[in-house]
Amino acid sequence: MRGIDKFKERFAGHDGEYVLIGGACDLLFGEAGQDFRATKDLDLVLLVEALTPEFGQVFWDFVREGGYENRQKSSGKPQFYRFSRPEDPAFPAMLELFARTDVSLRDAESGLMPIHIDDEVSSLSAILLDEDYYRLLVENRASAGGVAVLSVEGLIPFKAKAWLDLSARRAGGQAVDEKSVKKHRNDVCRLATLLAGGERPAMSEGVRADMRRFLEAYESDPVDLCFVKITFQ
């Protein structure tokens, strides 16, 4: 994954202040000796309640060192930042940050510009504002490749929820990319192959209800396992 080594090096010691979501599958499957869909961006959820001033300094140093040309920020909540087109190819092609509340990641020289929120970002933002899912994220952190990521047990309900949300938007007439919708359902199936069988992560009743809705929908339209390249050992 492009830039992951540079990210791991610079953010060492700050793994209690963020959780990697976008890019987590790549790392988790890599540790299992399997390939995953190529990921060009790193999506981070900032744990605002644990953030330190040092993290903000490390982050802006990272942005400056990478020479990110595009620096953008959304309005409203949750806060969303996007940094892309780094001058240094050793850095991630894109960094996306989510924070449920205001964070002190301000820099007078950053030149942040407004950003258009697409369906993927809007869906994840809505999920992160849900207290049940945020608690699920905080309680299901893991380490993969030396980076703090959302665990397999946490990613499955997150992706199931994203599929439900995007499917509902598409059914309601919104112009949602069908590939984005199917991607999350296929990812749930692939992630399930990494489960050892005895995991029972704590879930709120709301998250359990969403998982039941996902499974009911899946039973009526199952995934072609060959298409998602699931292998059995």
Question: Residue ranges of each PLM-predicted region?
Answer:
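Compositionally biased terminal segments of proteins
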Residues: 1-233
